[in-house]
Amino acid sequence: MYILFTLVLTFVFCKPIHSLQCYNCSHSTMQCTTSTSCTSNLDSCLIAKAGSGVYYRCWKFDDCSFKRISNQLSETQLKYHCCKKNLCNVNKGIENIKRTISDKALLLLALFLVTAWNFPL
């Protein structure tokens, strides 16, 4: 009886472990349709646009930063987005994904110049 009770509790409270599914294409110029199961250490999906191509792959969420992604992909200009749902790295609205550090730096520089121009020393 105790064994049966333990088995029932195990099935009720333990969820099966499924690996994350992500699209997986390198420097694609078209919509990616190939998917893959991510390994346990890659817990998010990445979509990164660089130049005329788009990268789709499994990615470690803690490494979802401009520096890590640009180093790994050997790209100096890119926009990227990491997500944690199955097949979430689709090429919809890629123009709205995170801006790169260089875009933010240009905006900050422009703001500084406007402020300096309006408030002379």
Swiss-Prot record:
All residue ranges annotated as the UPAR/Ly6 domain in the record: 20-104
Compartments, record wording: Host cell membrane
PROSITE patterns found in the cross-reference section: LY6_UPAR (PS00983)
InterPro entries: CD59, CD59_antigen_CS, LY6_UPA_recep-like, Snake_toxin-like_sf
Source taxon at top rank: Viruses
Propeptide: 97-121
Signal peptide per UniProt: 1-19
SMART domains listed in its UniProt record: LU
Membrane topology: Lipid-anchor; GPI-anchor
PANTHER family xrefs: CD59 GLYCOPROTEIN
Protein name stated in the entry: Surface glycoprotein CD59 homolog
Record organism: Saimiriine herpesvirus 2 (strain 11)
